[in-house]
Amino acid sequence: MVNDLAHRHSLSGVGGRASVGEEKMILGSDHGIWDWANEDDGFCPIDWTKSQSVFTFLKACDGVWDTPYYAESIAMARAAGKLAAPYVWLYNVDPRMQADFWYLRLADEPLIVIDFESYGNSIPDYDDLYNAIERLRELGYTGKIIVYTGHWYWLAHGNTADYWKQFPVWLARYSSAPPQPTPTFAKEIIWQFSASGNPANYGITNGKLAVDEDWFYGTQEQLEELFGGGAVPPIDPPPKPQHKIVIKIRS
């Protein structure tokens, strides 16, 4: 747990677990290339044995581009006993093609997070997210899908259709207060509460100055079930990309 975290967030607990009133929370983190690459794009592996996170999400794909060293990073996280799953960044460029790209790499994963937010000139809308999800299902993906977004972004670019109620939501709010209710989702299951975690508490070795931190609401058993019940899917080398779109990489 980050130094003085209990004080800053009115939480109590140790060993990656806390509580707010009767609600149990488990500490996690999320990471992208900037957490495991150096200035020369070389691999600086996260030392997962020093990470206080119980679970972690790692960026696998940036639209239709592979994240360098993702396969190595998630394998190392799992070998260290972390519950680990991929997330993918959605752009407002041909969501079905992006889903094709993700499926080729992540079809065996029991859980995928789709990152639904803006970056630069890319401002995906709910129809981009819908088409990406439906294409994954059309291709045969049967695992869980979590939507990552922010309250205000969803109000501006999501909608309140009942369709979205089937998906767990992971909400970002860098605050001591949990995210606001975000229709039409039920309460978030994961809260990204900070982007300023101490790198030393998460095994960062490349000199990065801050880490994204998350709380999962629930028990260890519920967390393990979310991540596939302990199943470890195979990690194969990514296939050669069949399409190319010029997109800046975002961690």
Give the residues covered by each predicted segment:
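Functionally critical loop-and-helix segments that line ligand-binding/catalytic clefts
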Residues: 20-51, 160-250
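Flexible, glycine-rich phosphate/dinucleotide-binding loops
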Residues: 65, 93, 154, 178, ...
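Aromatic side chains
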Residues: 70, 87-89, 148, 174, ...
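Catalytic domains of cell-wall/extracellular-matrix polysaccharide-remodeling enzymes
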Residues: 110-184
